């Protein structure tokens, strides 16, 4: 693991409590066997991610979770390896309910032929993974990111990139439900068909149905386990039916 990854994971895991200082630079160099330059660059990266703050009188102090950059893929990945909280998943589902329906309405009005083809390819990948085994989650992510990109709104297109890690986190858990991917295929098809038909109202209703179904799957997965699943590694590929 890189120095920034090792430090980031340690902070997210609570090894350095909020308000405490990281070890001094020479100690970090010794701990990780790296140069001062590497340590300084790692510190800069963690500052950019909102995990720590530095200053002449402050030193290098750990910030509270509300200061972290929740859209940073590394931060999300480190959080998932720590085991996610129920609050995190609630916030994520609420964010999806706010962003995706509005984006889908725009996609139904603006999607180009090329964008629709890209989403269709992603759906085919999902279907193939269900029927023949394979990486369902990656195709699922491409499907949803494709819909955001098809909105024709540059800010939503940018958001599709930063939402990637968050969406993957949601999909990793919801697809852990037995037969979950197979059951959701028809809902994904309904979303895509509504967008292709240029029917914003129908598309919005379909994506809400899909998001709420994913929430039920997540709740079911969580209720059957004492702790939220560990998803530090990619989801296990599906087996053929």
Tell me what each language-model feature is:
Residues 1-98, 105, 225-228, 232, ...:
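Short linear motifs at protein or domain termini
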Residues 2, 40, 136-140, 176-180, ...:
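Juxtamembrane/interface motifs at transmembrane-helix termini
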Residues 92-173, 184-193, 202-217:
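Conserved amphipathic alpha-helical segments that form helical-bundle/coiled-coil interaction surfaces
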Residues 201-241:
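C-terminal effector-binding regulatory domain of bacterial HTH transcription factors
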């Amino acid at each position: 693991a890189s120095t920034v990854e090792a430090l980031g994971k340690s902070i997210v895991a609570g090894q350095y409590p909020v308000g405490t200082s990281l070890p001094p630079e020479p100690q970090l160099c010794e701990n990780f066997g790296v140069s001062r330059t590497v340590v300084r660059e790692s510190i800069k990266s963690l500052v950019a991610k909102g995990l720590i703050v530095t200053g002449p009188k402050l030193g290098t102090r750990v910030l509270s979770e509300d200061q972290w950059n929740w859209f940073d893929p590394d931060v999300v990945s480190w959080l998932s390896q720590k085991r996610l909280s129920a609050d995190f998943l609630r916030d994520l589902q609420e964010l999806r309910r706010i962003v995706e329906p509005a984006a889908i309405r725009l996609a139904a009005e603006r999607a180009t032929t090329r964008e629709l083809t890209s989403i269709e390819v992603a759906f085919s990948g999902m279907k193939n993974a269900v029927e023949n085994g394979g990486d369902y989650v990656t195709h699922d992510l491409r499907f949803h990111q494709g819909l955001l990109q098809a909105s024709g709104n540059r800010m939503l297109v940018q958001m599709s990139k930063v939402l990637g890690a968050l969406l993957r986190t949601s999909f990793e858990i919801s697809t852990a439900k037995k037969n979950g991917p197979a059951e959701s295929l028809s809902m994904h098809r309904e979303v895509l068909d509504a967008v292709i038909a240029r029917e914003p109202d129908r598309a919005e209703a379909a994506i809400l149905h899909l998001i709420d179904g994913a929430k039920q799957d997540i709740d079911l997965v969580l209720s059957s386990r004492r702790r939220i699943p560990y998803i530090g590694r990619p989801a296990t590929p599906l087996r053929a039916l």
